[in-house]
Design a protein with these regions (language model features):
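Extracytoplasmic cysteine-anchoring/structural motifs
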Residues: 4-176
């Protein structure tokens, strides 16, 4: 524990998990007239390990479980539809972009992640990517993928890998 009081040391922290951001959009020129079909779509992501350990002495986070093939990021049910989210999910109505942000255990993927999307367009079709998302999820790094849903499938239009931004240095006192 690090407490600044009576000449103590400042605390320093590092990200020990990885962040994965998926930005999903539709292509108006490739079959979708309404960008809102993503707001109440179902999203399933497969290929990640969700269980693990964290060693407080070494600061190491590691996976210790099996790959999950059917993690529902967002599931929409009912009339009117309501969404149940398993991660941070936001829909930007102005742009039609659905963004999922996940904090995950660092891991090297044996296979590419499989993202399956069932848009709310009344056609009851699912779209999935084919070996497009395969990051080595490294501690302290953020990975962003932009995925475009087309009537013919999904297209990965770009990815970025970056360090997390510095939130600045802050200090304070804790007194008993």
């Amino acid at each position: 524990m690090c407490i600044r009081d009576r000449g103590g040391n400042d605390c320093s922290f590092k990200h020990k998990m990885a962040r994965l951001i998926l930005k999903v959009q539709v292509s108006n020129t490739d079959g979708f007239d309404d960008t809102a079909v993503l707001e109440f779509a179902d999203y399933k992501l497969g290929g990640l390990v969700h269980e693990g350990t964290f060693d407080v002495k070494t600061g190491t986070a590691a996976t210790a479980g099996s790959v999950v093939s059917d993690w529902m990021l967002r599931q929409c049910t009912g009339a009117p539809k309501t969404a149940t989210d398993k991660c941070v999910a936001t829909f930007d109505a102005a742009t039609g972009v659905m963004t999922f942000t996940m904090i995950l255990l660092p891991q090297t993927l044996a296979n590419a992640l499989v993202l399956e999307i069932s848009p709310d367009d009344g056609e009851y079709q699912s779209y999935s990517n084919k070996d497009m998302i395969k990051p080595a999820l490294e501690a302290g790094y953020s990975y962003t993928y932009t995925i475009t849903v087309k009537k013919t499938g999904l297209t990965l239009s770009g990815s970025t890998i970056e360090n997390w931004n510095d939130g600045g240095s802050h200090s304070g006192d804790a007194k008993m």
